[in-house]
């Protein structure tokens, strides 16, 4: 059995004169890798490259040892890959079951009984077993995201590419989905781009931070979070001298400083704190606005 893997070597992608990715080198093995970065960092472009929806302008991409630029090998990758794009187009009038069944048929699940059983399985995984007969257009945004995730989970693929899978999903279901992804990641490569830094902290051992198309950080989540140790504290007023400061739900301000401070009472840093510190405080956290796209 070949171990699931993805490799990128000096990968770049341009759109006309605009550079979306430059010099990206990554090796991805089974497990969940979180992808963070500000708007326009190149995250969605990177996911589309991994999902074979877009070719690189330079460099080499290999998925499961196959070259997505070779048509026959690209077809082989797509048969073994689950992809949930940031935006999913649903055909008018389709129910959740009909849509996932349609995708399963496209993926060559030709035996009707086995296909229907698999559709029921993935709908159950995402908490939609009771809503299979509901028309997708009548669903909430979070339910639609779960339908999109269900089709990506068909066949427990060795590679799973997810762009904002938990957007609009309620907290209880997000916990359920984390459990599903953690189980799949025991044998599959899962790449997860999300606004929710708490999803990355809960699910991922590894995080990649993109900025302006380049990798700013690639390593353990715990190491990145540790970089903010001794640099985070709560105060009654914002501190203009720190890298980032925002008002929390309690009314106090959470301050993140570029250097350790010994004149304040520190609090345990979060991944969000460390992410802001890495970016020099140039973005605000989810509690006050978007961190990443």
Task: Give the ranges of each region predicted by the language model.
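Conserved structural motif at the start of ABC-family nucleotide-binding domains
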Residues: 6, 21-23, 78
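Conserved ABC ATPase signature
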Residues: 135-139
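ABC transporter nucleotide-binding domain
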Residues: 175-256
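Helix-to-loop junction immediately C-terminal to a conserved catalytic motif
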Residues: 51
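Catalytic Walker B motif of ABC-type/P-loop ATPase nucleotide-binding domains
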Residues: 160-164, 169
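Conserved ABC ATPase "signature" region
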Residues: 101, 105, 113-131
């Amino acid at each position: 059995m070949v171990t699931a893997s993805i490799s990128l070597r000096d990968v770049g992608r341009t759109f006309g004169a605009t550079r979306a990715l430059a010099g990206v080198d990554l090796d991805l093995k089974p497990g969940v890798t979180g992808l963070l970065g500000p708007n326009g960092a190149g995250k969605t472009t990177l996911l589309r490259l991994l999902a074979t929806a877009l070719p690189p302008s330079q460099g080499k991409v290999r998925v499961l040892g196959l070259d997505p630029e070779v048509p026959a090998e690209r077809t082989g990758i797509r048969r073994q890959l689950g992809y949930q794009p940031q935006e999913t187009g649903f055909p008018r009038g389709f129910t959740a079951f009909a849509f996932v069944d349609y995708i399963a048929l496209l993926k060559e699940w030709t035996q009707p009984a086995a296909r229907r059983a698999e559709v029921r399985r993935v709908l159950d995984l995402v908490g939609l077993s009771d809503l299979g007969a509901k028309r997708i257009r009548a669903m909430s945004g979070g339910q639609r995201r779960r339908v999109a995730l269900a089709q990506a989970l068909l066949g427990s693929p060795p590679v799973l590419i997810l762009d904002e899978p938990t957007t609009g999903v309620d907290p209880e279901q997000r916990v359920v989905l984390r459990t599903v992804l953690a189980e799949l990641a025991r044998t599959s490569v899962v790449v997860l781009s999300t606004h929710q830094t708490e999803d990355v902290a809960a699910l991922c051992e590894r995080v990649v931070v993109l900025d302006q198309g380049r990798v700013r950080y690639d390593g353990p989540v715990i190491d990145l979070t540790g970089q903010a140790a001794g640099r985070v504290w709560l105060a009654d007023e914002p501190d203009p001298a720190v890298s980032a400061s925002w008002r929390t739900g309690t009314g106090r301000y959470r301050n993140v400083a570029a250097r350790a401070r010994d004149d304040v009472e520190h609090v345990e840093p979060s991944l969000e704190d460390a992410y802001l510190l890495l970016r020099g405080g140039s973005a605000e956290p989810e509690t006050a606005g978007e961190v990443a796209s």
